[in-house]
């Protein structure tokens, strides 16, 4: 079934790409009949598939099914809108791309936690949805599955509005400077060099919500296409010819001289020295002469204008009338969106080259760089048979020169000239190195901001994971039943009191409490950061990722760390109330969360003490790791916590599931079942 879903997704995704391009095409170039035919086909597919997708997402969702449902709904609506816009060609673009009116890409969610604690969440960007999912992942145990599913449904509806049909998201619905949960997970595995996670993520660019497409070289691509169509294309590479420097000519002549030499020839001394000079100086970026008279950016725009002239020839002389012809970018806008025949990567590369050329035009630094390296001078001497001038022997250091009482004025001037030349040499090296580092940094920043981006799968994966968590919780409660002894009955009260009295006189060792702390951390770690596999992270690390992604406050981390202390006794965690496990009394979210911590702490410590006292092996499991089935033979026996206030605990034993509201009544029932094999 998954293969058919993936095949349908790929076809719908490709059709969405085509339709998103149709929105910018000249209306007279489109066939109204084909648009209507495509609209009818998509409508039939939507009718046939939507019910199955809805059922799939209500049982066990996946990122593919969630995104496919959004694409189908948006594609059906958009094609219908395009068809009606084509009926009036003059207003085609204004109907499709008009920004008149109020923006509807805003959503306000009201999330209801336990005990009627409500929180309002404002959604505007894709980042807001991801942030909401990360925070819900941190407090998943503080609300019922029905409330969570209602909030997630509204968030997914808003995500569908942002998704549209184009694989390229609008630039006003996301920001890359805000980190996501995946950024936290990736940053946590690299060396931090003593810096905190917030410091490492300070200038971080996120490429998970929207993925950056690697740039492709497109220079010469359109020229080849035009030539294949039979057009004679001649594009001047430079608006103004760039003069070839003397040094460049010598270098080319040297390479031509070496071309005639093979490994079967004897190697003369001049050839060997020439080869060595070329080899050892190949890694040095020699600054070009000031012969560059045309900027690289100007060349791009000149090429753009030249290629634009060939477009009417391909359209029988008719002027082009696509959206980008009627609303073409001008001035500085070209720097941010590029042109039809050039990409933003070409623009950024040209800007970098122009900055480098401008720097190297400075007379002093260029002159110093020329004097620094004698490569071209020596190449010329070898090629033309001249003697290589030897460098005059440098004078001794300035200190020894000054100590000599008979030092002449010429020696002092020569020493000063050598020092000046060494200083300028170092200055040019350092300046050029800093320039290249600066240009590389800004090139990466511009590529991050201006490069083409497409929709990522992170938000849909996180949505599917959280949906399944709450769907499984709901299913577990639905398929479980009440025990033979009704919850809250006098019999259960006596059973609960017996277990409590027995546990009060026992205690847990300090070493065991440290181990149980990790088990407690595992129960409050959200499903988005719960790792499974051969080498999962420890529970405390997984919880740290969960809290960092939700921007948990330091004082809250302190309270959480103090929940289980090495000196705790049973009276510190056992609640005296009967049949009120996971009953929330606080009215604010922080209070609700702290009360949930206390209940889960009581669960972990009391079950551990029960296992020691009666030599049992009752294990605690979460209900979000597996979907309950009608046949429970594949489910492990043990205690399952659902985090549902009305049915928090489920005991699975002998292929049966019983709901308990009191922890100690459940422990008594498990003891009787383990001893006698029947529930008394």
Swiss-Prot record:
Binding site for ATP: 610-617
GO CC annotation terms, alphabetical: host cell nucleus
Chief site of localization: host cell
Function: Component of the molecular motor that translocates viral genomic DNA in empty capsid during DNA packaging. Forms a tripartite terminase complex together with TRM2 and TRM3 in the host cytoplasm. Once the complex reaches the host nucleus, it interacts with the capsid portal vertex. This portal forms a ring in which genomic DNA is translocated into the capsid. TRM1 carries an endonuclease activity that plays an important role for the cleavage of concatemeric viral DNA into unit length genomes.
Superkingdom per UniProt: Viruses
Identification of the protein by name: Tripartite terminase subunit 1
Pfam families membership: PRTP
Alphabetical list of InterPro entries matching this protein: UL28/UL56
Family affiliation: Belongs to the herpesviridae TRM1 protein family.
Zinc finger regions, C3H1-type: 180-208
Presence of the UniProt keyword Signal in the record: no
Alphabetized UniProt keyword annotations: ATP-binding, Host nucleus, Late protein, Metal-binding, Nucleotide-binding, Viral genome packaging, Viral release from host cell, Zinc, Zinc-finger
MF annotations from Gene Ontology: ATP binding; zinc ion binding
Subcellular localization: Host nucleus
GO biological process annotation, one example: viral DNA genome packaging
Self-association state and partner proteins as the record states: Associates with TRM2 and TRM3 to form the tripartite terminase complex. Interacts with portal protein.
Organism this protein belongs to: Alcelaphine herpesvirus 1 (strain C500) (AlHV-1)
Keyword field contains Nucleotide-binding: yes
């Amino acid at each position: 079934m998954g293969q058919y879903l993936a095949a349908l997704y790929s076809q719908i995704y490709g059709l969405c790409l085509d339709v998103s391009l149709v929105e910018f095409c000249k209306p007279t170039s489109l066939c109204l009949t084909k648009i209507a035919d495509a609209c009818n086909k998509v409508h039939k597919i939507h009718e046939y598939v939507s019910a199955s997708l809805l059922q799939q997402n209500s049982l066990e969702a996946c990122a593919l099914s969630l995104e496919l449902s959004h694409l189908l709904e948006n594609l059906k609506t958009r094609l219908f809108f395009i068809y009606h816009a084509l009926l009036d060609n003059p207003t085609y673009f204004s109907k499709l791309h008009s920004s008149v009116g109020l923006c509807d890409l805003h959503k306000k969610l009201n999330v209801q936690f336990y005990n009627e604690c409500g929180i309002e969440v404002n959604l505007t960007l894709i980042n807001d949805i991801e942030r909401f999912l990360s925070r819900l992942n941190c407090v998943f145990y503080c609300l019922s599955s029905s409330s969570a599913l209602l909030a997630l449904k509204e968030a997914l509806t808003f995500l569908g509005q942002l998704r549209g049909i184009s694989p390229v998201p609008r630039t006003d619905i996301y920001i890359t400077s805000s980190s996501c949960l995946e950024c936290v997970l990736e940053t946590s595995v690299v060396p931090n060099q003593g810096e905190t996670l917030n410091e490492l993520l300070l200038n971080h660019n996120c490429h998970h919500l929207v993925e950056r497409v690697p740039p492709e070289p497109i220079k010469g691509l359109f020229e080849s296409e035009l030539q294949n169509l039979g057009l004679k294309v001649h594009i001047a590479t430079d608006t103004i010819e760039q003069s070839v420097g003397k040094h460049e000519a010598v270098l080319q002549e040297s390479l031509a001289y070496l071309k005639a030499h093979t490994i079967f020839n004897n190697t003369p001394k001049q050839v060997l020295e020439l080869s060595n000079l070329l080899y050892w100086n190949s890694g040095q970026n020699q600054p070009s002469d000031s012969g560059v008279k045309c900027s690289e950016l100007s060349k791009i725009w000149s090429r753009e204008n030249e290629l634009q002239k060939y477009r009417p020839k391909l359209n029988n002389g008719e002027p082009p009338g696509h959206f980008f012809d009627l609303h073409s970018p001008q001035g500085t806008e070209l720097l941010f969106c590029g042109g039809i025949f050039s990409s933003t990567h070409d623009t950024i590369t040209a800007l970098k080259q122009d900055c480098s050329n401008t720097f190297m035009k400075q007379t002093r630094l260029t002159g110093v760089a020329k004097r620094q390296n004698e490569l071209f001078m020596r190449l010329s001497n070898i090629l033309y048979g001249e003697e290589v001038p030897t460098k005059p022997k440098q004078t001794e250091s300035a200190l020894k020169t000054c100590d000599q009482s008979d030092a002449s004025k010429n020696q002092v001037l020569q020493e000063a000239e050598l020092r000046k030349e060494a200083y300028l040499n170092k200055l040019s090296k350092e300046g050029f190195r800093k320039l290249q580092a600066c240009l590389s940094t800004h090139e990466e920043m511009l590529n991050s901001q201006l490069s083409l981006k497409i929709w990522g799968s992170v938000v849909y994966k996180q949505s599917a994971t959280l949906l399944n968590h709450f769907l499984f919780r709901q299913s577990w409660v639905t398929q479980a039943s009440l025990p033979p002894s009704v919850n809250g009955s006098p019999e259960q009260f006596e059973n609960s009191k017996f277990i409590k009295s027995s546990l009060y006189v026992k205690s847990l060792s300090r070493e065991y409490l440290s181990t149980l702390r990790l088990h407690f951390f595992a129960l409050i770690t959200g499903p988005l950061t719960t790792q499974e596999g051969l080498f999962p992270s420890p529970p405390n690390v997984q919880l740290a990722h969960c809290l960092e992604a939700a921007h948990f406050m330091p004082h809250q981390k302190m309270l959480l760390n103090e929940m289980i202390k090495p000196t705790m006794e049973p009276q510190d965690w056992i609640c005296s109330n009967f049949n009120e496990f996971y009953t929330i009394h606080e009215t604010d979210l922080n209070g609700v969360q702290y009360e949930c911590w206390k209940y889960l702490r009581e669960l972990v410590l009391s079950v551990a003490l029960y296992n020691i006292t009666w030599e049992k092996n009752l294990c605690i499991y979460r209900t979000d790791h597996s979907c309950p089935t009608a046949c429970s033979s594949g489910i492990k026996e043990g205690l399952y916590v659902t985090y549902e206030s009305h049915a928090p605990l489920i005991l699975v034993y002998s292929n049966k599931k019983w709901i308990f509201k009191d922890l100690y009544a459940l422990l008594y029932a498990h003891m009787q079942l383990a001893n006698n094999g029947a529930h008394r």
